Each structure stands twice: as C-alpha cells, then as structure tokens.
Amino acid sequence: NKLLGNDLNAAGIELTMRGGTYRFRTTASFCITGADMQATLDGESVPMYTVISASPMQELKFKTAAKGMRTYLLVKGGIDVPKIMGSSSTFCDGKFGGHNGRALRTGDVLHLAEDCQADNFNSFDGKYIPKIDNTWTIGVLPGPQPTYEYLKPEYLDTLTSSEYTVNFNSARTGIRLNGPVPQWVREEGGEAGLHPSNI
C-alpha cells in the first residue's frame, strides 16, 4: 500500500499458494508483494514490488508460489469492500467481511476506488524486501501453565531442536505441525490440548 501511496489499511487481495487470473475493466495501477507467483500481464512478466499500470481488458495471471505461501495484489486506492469491525478482511468460517464473506470465485467482480491510477510511482528500497524461503526458524515460549508438570524435560530439548512441517489442516486461526510427538509426564489427566486424557 505504501508503494502505491494508499492508506496503509486499504484492502487488497491475499493469494495463498496459487494465484488465479484477473482481468482489469479499467486503467489501474497495481503492485505485487510477498511470495513470487511468477505473475504475467498479457503474457509479459510482472516484476515484484514495482508499480505497474494495467489497461482495460488486460489479464493478470499468477502461477504458484515456489517459496513462501502468500502473495499480495494491491491496487491504487484499494478494493472497495465494506469494513466490518474496522477490517476489510474476509473471515470465511464466519461468512462475513471482504467480498461476500467468502473466498473469491470465477466470475466475481471487484470494485476499485474511483481514483485507481497512481500519479507518481514510488520506489521501494530493495533492502526492505523480505527474504522468503521454505524453511523458517520459529520461537517457542512457555505458556501460563507449569510446563514441567506436563512435558518431560527431554521433550522440550527435542521440541527446540527438531524440524517440523506444516500440516495441510492448518489455517489462519492455527498452524498444525507434523513432527515429534510430545512426551507427557503423566499418562493421564491434565489440561493440555494434546494430552491423551482429552477427547
């Protein structure tokens, strides 16, 4: 949004894993950030973190993300969707927000702000472009419960030294990891979510 001179809270499109195809019905300035999905505009490669001008009927196509997971398509002025609780985001599980409270479908028409052409093209310092990879180091903090009453100390060492993969059942509300199974101090009882006593 900053690159386009938009309000920082202007609505855009978040693309997860794969991007789809979008046709402009008016002249509009846009930019793409996040994971590189090898976008093309009428077959011509579109650079990331660069303001591009699209003409009516031009087609913007995305492939899939080779590294990273989410790509962001922003348009000058933002996408015209209602704000709910101060946010333009879509909450698919709750069926509200964004465009009709759901993921985009073929044939959907998104309305842009009246002024959707950038007057001047801001530059973006390359040092601020995040390095996106498929392997990440994440931090771990103990929760409010007394950790050592639930988990064996040796498992905590395993937890912080192992590699995990993201489970396909993950979503915005929570990430499930595949990796070493917790080693519990007690065989039954307790309140931890994954504990064998919890059904």
Residue ranges and their predicted role:
Residues 1-199:
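Conserved "landmark" site that anchors the functional core of diverse proteins
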